[in-house]
């Protein structure tokens, strides 16, 4: 199936089509633009793609125009479903924005492949004291020096309130004004490319936030009464869904074309309920490939999925979806259990080095095996001939796994340097694509907590209660869970950059820099396939080792020293001074790791 995009995403910069709107539910639509009213007419239908569209004549086309829509005589103007700017909030008028006006300086940027890369996940509001795109741009040289290749931004689309994780967005085409708005976003991507960094934008297509969502007033964007964890499901396969899918695909095209991002992280794709013969994820992959060919650089789509289904990664010509990557939560769980000892909730199946060994070899732990947390079998095996290990994006910490702890405590708030070093070595030398959570690299002491700023008190209360209910199986004590609506919860989550130069923080930061440098200089760590990973371990002595080509990674999870034979002749990296390589015997101190070569 071949599609040519974008459609409405390419609204002319000038002319009345800028204000065209899909409102099949309306009997009449009036455009309010620049303080004047313009009666809109139904678009002449040449095919089903025109059904439900309205157009206006004579509306202003120059400058920044504030505008909205009056439906069926209602005197309250609604923002544009495709609004590019909401300077006064999600309930106010939209403002026109011309993305082609920006003068890009990144013509030399050739893009970046996922294989061999390191991703750095950050939230704009808490990454810097200012919480803006401009302030984040001031840290690009630091990130380049850290050795990362992609910056992955948590969602930036417009939401109600001042601060939020970003998953309550309601205007998918608009960049949140508190971050700087759409032009600031263009400047940030331009600056990132100048620093040699790609940008991956986290996007949410499975639900909309609870405040400021006017899409149902215009058309059947949602499946009323058919929901997921976060609200009504998006209408991907019901009546009118051709236009809804078009809306989403045009949004995907906007990020890749107008903002020149290098990839998208697709939030919770298991919640995209689509019974069509061609799943929308397949359309995503086809569109991204089309745009990649147009712009002449690689573009990457990474799915967050808890299905453990490698079909996401298989080529479309063999009935796959053709995405470049997907998250592997199993890797996180196996690492987490083995450095913390926690086995509650969904960690219960990962309470052994055997689980970690299986993940390193096979990519998934649950590949058709029984999941005690789900109380059913889960996942399917990966076809090693069809998928490279780099297609699995892994981490020891991320915004979900830390933020969805009762108090949002990072590993660095409870674990010693040695345990943090073990997690770092596993993540950055394993077969997969590593992703770091902002501040992880220096062992940030600040938590990453769940925060909201809903102006409506009832929404704030419902959010706090719903969150505790969602994670009741993790054994949370409600008394210690921070109030998401308390401004202090947000402020506590901001990084303290001063500590990165102090004590074990600085020591850990240097280890991360050494690990990213080692990845770049050691092809065996990044280029080999699944079948090239060999793993051995001793459950009682608590050591594990794995080989990739001519490189071995040795890890001691115990509080006692360990000696390992057959360790090679060259020490490439050690997590502390207690590590020794004598002949081909490695001496590892407690909670330490080494990378050696033959």
UniProtKB/Swiss-Prot annotation:
It catalyses: hydrolysis of (1->4)-alpha-D-glucosidic linkage in 4-alpha-D-[(1->4)-alpha-D-glucanosyl]n trehalose to yield trehalose and (1->4)-alpha-D-glucan. Keywords: Carbohydrate metabolism, Cytoplasm, Glycosidase, Hydrolase. InterPro entries: DUF3459, Glyco_hydro_13_cat_dom, Glycoside_hydrolase_SF, Ig-like_fold, Ig_E-set, Trehalose_TreZ, Trehalose_TreZ_E-set_sf. GO terms for molecular function: 4-alpha-D-(1->4)-alpha-D-glucanotrehalose trehalohydrolase activity. The active site is at 267 (nucleophile), 304 (proton donor). The record marks 400 as: Transition state stabilizer. Pathway: Glycan biosynthesis; trehalose biosynthesis. Its EC number is 3.2.1.141. It is found in: Cytoplasm. Substrate binds at residues 265-270, 329-333, 399-404. GO terms for biological process: trehalose biosynthetic process. GO terms for cellular component: cytoplasm. SUPFAM superfamilies: (Trans)glycosidases, E set domains. Signal peptide: none annotated. The keyword Hydrolase applies. It comes from the Bacteria. Belongs to the glycosyl hydrolase 13 family. This is Malto-oligosyltrehalose trehalohydrolase. It comes from Arthrobacter sp. (strain Q36). The lineage of its organism: Bacteria, Bacillati, Actinomycetota, Actinomycetes, Micrococcales.
């Amino acid at each position: 199936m071949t599609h040519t995009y974008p459609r409405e995403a390419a609204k002319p910069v000038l002319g009345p089509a800028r204000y065209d709107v899909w409102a099949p539910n309306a009997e009449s639509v009036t455009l309010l633009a620049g303080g004047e009213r313009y009666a809109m007419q139904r678009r002449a239908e040449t095919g089903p793609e025109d059904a439900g569209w309205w157009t206006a004549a004579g509306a202003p086309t120059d400058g920044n125009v504030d505008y909205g829509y009056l439906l069926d005589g209602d005197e309250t103007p609604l923002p544009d479903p495709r609004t590019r700017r909401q300077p006064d909030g999600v309930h106010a008028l939209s403002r026109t924005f011309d993305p082609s006006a920006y003068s890009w300086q990144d013509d030399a940027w050739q893009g970046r492949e996922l294989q061999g890369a390191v991703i750095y996940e950050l939230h704009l509001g808490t990454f810097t004291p200012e919480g803006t795109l401009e302030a984040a741009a001031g840290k690009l040289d630091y990130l380049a020096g850290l050795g990362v290749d992609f910056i992955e931004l948590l969602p930036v689309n417009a939401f109600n309130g001042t601060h939020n994780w970003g998953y309550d967005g309601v205007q998918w085409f608009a960049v949140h004004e508190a971050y700087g708005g759409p032009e600031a976003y263009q400047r940030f991507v331009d600056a990132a490319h100048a620093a040699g960094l790609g940008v991956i934008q986290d996007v949410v297509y499975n639900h909309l936030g609870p405040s400021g969502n006017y899409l149902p007033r215009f058309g059947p964007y949602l499946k009323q009464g058919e929901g997921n964890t976060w609200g009504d499901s998006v209408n991907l396969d019901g009546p009118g869904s051709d236009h809804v899918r078009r809306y989403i695909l045009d949004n995907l095209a906007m990020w890749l074309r107008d903002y020149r991002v290098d990839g998208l992280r697709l939030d919770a794709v298991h919640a995209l309920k689509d019974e069509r013969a061609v799943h929308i994820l397949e359309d995503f992959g086809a569109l991204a490939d089309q745009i990649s060919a147009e712009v002449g650089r690689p573009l990457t789509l990474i799915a967050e999925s808890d299905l453990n289904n490698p079909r996401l990664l298989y080529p479309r010509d063999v009935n796959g979806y053709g995405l470049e990557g997907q998250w592997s939560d199993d890797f996180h769980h196996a690492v987490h259990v083995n450095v913390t000892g926690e086995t509650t909730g969904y960690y219960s199946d990962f309470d052994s080095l055997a689980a970690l060994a299986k993940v390193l070899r096979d990519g998934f732990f649950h590949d058709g095996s029984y999941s005690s947390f789900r109380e059913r079998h889960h996942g399917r095996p990966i076809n090693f001939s069809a998928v490279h290990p780099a297609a699995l994006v892994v981490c020891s910490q991320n915004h979900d796994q830390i933020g969805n702890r009762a108090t949002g405590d990072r590993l660095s708030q409870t674990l010693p340097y040695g345990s943090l070093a073990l997690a770092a070595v596993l993540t950055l030398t394993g077969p997969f694509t590593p992703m770091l959570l902002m501040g992880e690299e220096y062992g940030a002491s600040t938590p990453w907590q769940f925060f909201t700023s809903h102006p409506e008190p009832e929404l704030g209360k419902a959010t706090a209660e719903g969150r505790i209910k969602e994670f009741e199986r993790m054994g949370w004590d409600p008394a210690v869970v921070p109030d998401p609506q308390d401004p202090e919860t947000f402020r506590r989550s901001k990084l303290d950059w001063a500590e990165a130069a102090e004590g074990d923080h600085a020591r850990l930061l240097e280890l991360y820099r050494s690990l990213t440098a080692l990845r770049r200089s050691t092809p065996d760590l990044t280029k080999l396939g699944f079948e090239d990973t060999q793993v051995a371990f001793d459950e009682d002595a608590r050591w594990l080792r794995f080989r990739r080509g001519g490189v071995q990674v040795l890890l001691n999870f115990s509080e006692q020293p360990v000696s390992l034979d057959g360790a090679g002749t060259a020490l490439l990296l050690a997590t502390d001074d207690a590590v020794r390589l004598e002949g081909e015997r490695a001496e590892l101190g407690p909670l330490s790791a080494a990378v050696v070569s033959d």
